[in-house]
Amino acid sequence: MRIADYSVTRAVLDRHGFTFKKSFGQNFLTDTNILQKIVDTAEIDRSVNVIEIGPGIGALTEFLAENAAEVMAFEIDDRLIPILADTLRDFDNVQVINQDILKSDLQSQIKQFKNPDLPLKVVANLPYYITTPILMHLIESKIPFQEFVVMMQREVADRISAEPNTKAYGSLSIAVQYYMTAKVAFIVPKTVFVPAPNVDSAILKMVRRPEPLIEVTDEDFFFRVAKVGFIHRRKTLWNNLTSHFGKTEEIKTKLTQALELADIKPSIRGEALTIPQYGKLADALKEVGF
C-alpha cells in the first residue's frame, strides 16, 4: 500500500485529525500511477538530489525517496510535520524542512545534502495560489537547478509554455522561457485529489538553458519592457509603450527611434513579439536614453 492510495490517505488524515487549510491551497494527490509518471518525467535516479515543495502527507515524497539520492522537502504547515515523520519514517534520505520556501536561505539549505555536488532537480505539486512567486523565486535564485517538474493549475502551465501569437502568451511566458525551456508533459484531472480542486492540473517540465535564451544589456529593464508589451493585450505595442513611458513629443521621438533600431513596427501587438524581439527592443530603448 502506498501513501497515495485513497484508503491510506484517508486513514492518515483521520488518525492525525488533520483538516485542510484553504489558505495553504492543500490538495493531496491520490493516484499512484500519476505519481510514478511524475518521477519518470523528471528522470529521477540515485545520481540526483531533489527539492520538493509542499509535500503534504508525503505521497510524492515516497516515490521520490525511493528513486533519488536524497530529498529535501519544504513544508510550511506545522501540523504536517509530525504526519510526515510518521509516513516517511522508513526513509533515511529525506529531510523535511518546516519553512516557507520563499523565506528560506536556499543556498545554505542545499549544503545540508549529504552530497551537495549532485545535480539538483525540483519536483513538486505546487500550491495554486502561490505557483508563480515560487517558480520565479527558484529560477532567479542563481541555484543551478537542472530542471523542474512541477504540477500546477493547467491554465498557468499553458501560460508559462505558450508561444507568441497565442492567447496564453504573456510576460510570464517570457520571464520563464528566458531561463528555461518549458513544455506541458501531461494533464492531471481534478478528480484524483483530496479535496478536489475546481480545475484540472498539468505537469510542466522545465529544463534550464546553459545560458539565458538571449543576451540583454539590462535584465531588469528587459523584463519591465516585456510587461509593458502586455499592459493592454488588444492594443498596439505603440499604445502600450506610450501608456507606460509617456506621450510627450520628446518621448515619442525616442520611442520611434528605438523601434526603428530594433526593426519592429509600432502597429504590432505585444503578443506577436518573440523573446529575441523583446530583447532587441529593450536594448534599443536603453540606447536612446530610457
Curated annotation (Swiss-Prot):
One GO CC annotation: cytosol
Protein name per UniProt: Ribosomal RNA small subunit methyltransferase A
Binding of S-adenosyl-L-methionine, residues: 27, 29, 54, 75, 100, 125
Record-linked CDD domains: AdoMet_MTases
One example GO MF annotation: 16S rRNA (adenine(1518)-N(6)/adenine(1519)-N(6))-dimethyltransferase activity
Family matches, as SMART domains: rADc (SM00650)
Pfam families registered for this protein in UniProt: RrnaAD (PF00398)
UniProt keywords, alphabetically: Cytoplasm, Methyltransferase, RNA-binding, rRNA processing, S-adenosyl-L-methionine, Transferase
UniProt key word Transmembrane helix: no
PANTHER family: DIMETHYLADENOSINE TRANSFERASE, DIMETHYLADENOSINE TRANSFERASE-RELATED
PROSITE patterns (UniProt xref): RRNA_A_DIMETH (PS01131), SAM_RNA_A_N6_MT (PS51689)
Family: Belongs to the class I-like SAM-binding methyltransferase superfamily. rRNA adenine N(6)-methyltransferase family. RsmA subfamily.
Spans traversing the lipid bilayer: none
Gene that specifies this protein: rsmA
EC number, UniProt record: 2.1.1.182
Subcellular location: Cytoplasm
Catalytic reactions on record: adenosine(1518)/adenosine(1519) in 16S rRNA + 4 S-adenosyl-L-methionine = N(6)-dimethyladenosine(1518)/N(6)-dimethyladenosine(1519) in 16S rRNA + 4 S-adenosyl-L-homocysteine + 4 H(+)
Function statement: Specifically dimethylates two adjacent adenosines (A1518 and A1519) in the loop of a conserved hairpin near the 3'-end of 16S rRNA in the 30S particle. May play a critical role in biogenesis of 30S subunits.
